[in-house]
């Protein structure tokens, strides 16, 4: 079976780390053990520096990061990760499990920030071409639930400190995009943890078995 790229998406506090662990466990039970893990922004030395710039509220002092500058930093980090880590791993037969990818930008910057969606799509296509994840698990939570969980973890980053309205717009865009793309599977992450884990196991298992069919 050809190696695949699986991405886990969702608002802050959606449970992406737990979901990743369930995905890994499920794939291993299906006989897939050669995997690497990525996060966005980040995953390379350059991309991690960009992550610090875009998420650390103190990284640029009092200077305000403009919405378009934010988008371009995300894409700079993304293309570096894709070209130097993800594509080589896939070519080597290694599965890639990612914490966020381009759907985050389409939702957060397109929905939350209100940046023109055509511009974002054009930028995506120019930077990534036709490269897309094979499977995306979108963990759907309300901002109220997600941010409560995120705040319980400790200090919030620059984006996590945005308003509920911002996250409501982001969630709405996530749901809109998920409804348009069959490769995106929505998981109700407001359920009890065991139910969420079961839904992830079932989705991944069925998807992998369909690949073998």
From Swiss-Prot:
The gene is tmk. Catalyzes the reversible phosphorylation of deoxythymidine monophosphate (dTMP) to deoxythymidine diphosphate (dTDP), using ATP as its preferred phosphoryl donor. Situated at the junction of both de novo and salvage pathways of deoxythymidine triphosphate (dTTP) synthesis, is essential for DNA synthesis and cellular growth. This is Thymidylate kinase. The record marks 153 as: Transition state stabilizer. Belongs to the thymidylate kinase family. It is an enzyme of class 2 (transferase). Keywords: ATP-binding, Kinase, Nucleotide biosynthesis, Nucleotide-binding, Transferase. DTMP binds at residues 12, 74, 78, 100, 105, 108-109. Residues 147-159 are annotated as: LID. Homodimer. Pathway: Pyrimidine metabolism; dTTP biosynthesis. Its EC number is 2.7.4.9. ATP binds at residues 10-17.
